[in-house]
């Protein structure tokens, strides 16, 4: 099935606003690309991972009307400030090729690279996670995923069991296994996410250490680490479940939280967990703590 693709070029400070607008308008995928051929490495904590000029690609179903979409997007912009744009009809195979051309390796910490599965890793001796997320799932460029990967690279995961709740592409579960964990359970309500996770685990040689599950079918095991990169609302609902899924002394890593939601999350989880100082990237927060 063909798609309608919008391409808009904005500054780094405008990316979040535009991405949110595109998602609200019905985009099935929003991808951030380098607009000026500027190299991107995973930055230190607190620094933006975006290029100074960023091209935002948004994919809409073919049934969408481009003129209506543009009118909707322009409503919240002054006429002279709306970004330059173009749109085109994109066949499935062309979208996949374009996406593959722009997915570049990213480094997290001193030892982990997230690399496209079709390119050789920049540092073959490093810990290399080969990722092929497809249209629907992320690659590590979003601040919440970057925060989680950075935290995992600094943790002692040897012989650990980890639960990745809301796994998407499986990037966090697979990273944990590549960094020394011996078992991982990847949980997601979307069957396509579970399929993508299994395929990515196979590409990385860790499928024998990984189980996938929907939330409704999850067996309540105990984990040494539980990471949940979702959103504040489901995190608030899941606090008691996460307490049941973790050993005393186990680590809990929560992301997908904005700065103004920290206190509500801490109050909800305070019955079971003690948290360290938040890690913040842009306005996104990672809360890491341990089970009492």
Curated annotation (Swiss-Prot):
Pfam families for the chain: PrmA (PF06325)
InterPro entries: Ribosomal_L11_MeTrfase_PrmA, Ribosomal_PrmA_MeTrfase, SAM-dependent_MTases_sf
Annotated GO MF terms: protein-lysine N-methyltransferase activity
EC number, as in UniProt: 2.1.1.-
Keyword tags: Cytoplasm, Methyltransferase, S-adenosyl-L-methionine, Transferase
Enzyme class: transferase
Signal peptide (from-to): none
Positions annotated to bind S-adenosyl-L-methionine: 145, 166, 188, 229
Catalyzed reactions: L-lysyl-[protein] + 3 S-adenosyl-L-methionine = N(6),N(6),N(6)-trimethyl-L-lysyl-[protein] + 3 S-adenosyl-L-homocysteine + 3 H(+)
Gene Ontology CC terms, in alphabetical order: cytosol
A GO biological-process term: methylation
Localization per Swiss-Prot or TrEMBL: Cytoplasm
Function: Methylates ribosomal protein L11.
Entry similarity comment: Belongs to the methyltransferase superfamily. PrmA family.
Protein name: Ribosomal protein L11 methyltransferase
Organism: Nitrosococcus oceani (strain ATCC 19707 / BCRC 17464 / JCM 30415 / NCIMB 11848 / C-107)
């Amino acid at each position: 099935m063909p798609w309608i693709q919008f391409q808009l070029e904005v500054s780094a400070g405008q990316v979040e606003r535009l991405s949110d607008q595109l998602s609200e308008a019905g985009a099935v995928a929003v991808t951030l690309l380098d607009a000026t051929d500027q190299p991107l490495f995973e930055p230190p904590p607190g620094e933006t991972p975006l290029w100074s000029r960023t091209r935002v690609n948004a994919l809409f179903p073919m049934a969408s009307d481009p003129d209506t979409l543009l009118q909707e997007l322009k409503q919240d912009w002054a006429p002279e400030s709306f970004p330059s744009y173009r749109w085109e009809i994109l066949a499935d195979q062309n979208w996949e090729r374009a996406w593959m051309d722009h997915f570049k390796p990213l480094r997290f910490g001193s030892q982990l690279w997230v690399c496209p599965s079709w390119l050789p890793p920049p540092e073959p001796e490093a810990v290399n996670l080969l990722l092929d997320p497809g249209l629907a799932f992320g690659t590590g460029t979003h601040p919440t995923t970057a925060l989680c990967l950075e935290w995992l690279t600094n943790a002692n995961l040897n012989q650990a069991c980890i639960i990745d709740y809301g796994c998407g592409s499986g990037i966090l579960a697979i990273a944990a296994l590549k960094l020394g964990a011996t078992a991982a359970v990847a949980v997601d309500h979307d069957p396509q996410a579970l399929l993508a996770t299994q395929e990515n685990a196979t590409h990385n040689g860790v499928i024998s250490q990984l189980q996938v599950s929907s939330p409704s079918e999850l067996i309540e095991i105990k984990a040494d680490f539980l990471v949940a990169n979702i959103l504040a609302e489901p995190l608030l609902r899941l606090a008691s479940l996460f307490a049941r899924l973790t050993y005393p002394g186990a680590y809990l890593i929560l992301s997908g939280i904005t700065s103004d939601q920290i206190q509500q999350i801490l109050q909800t989880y305070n019955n079971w967990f003690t948290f360290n100082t938040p890690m913040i990237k842009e306005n996104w927060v990672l809360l890491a703590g341990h089970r009492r």
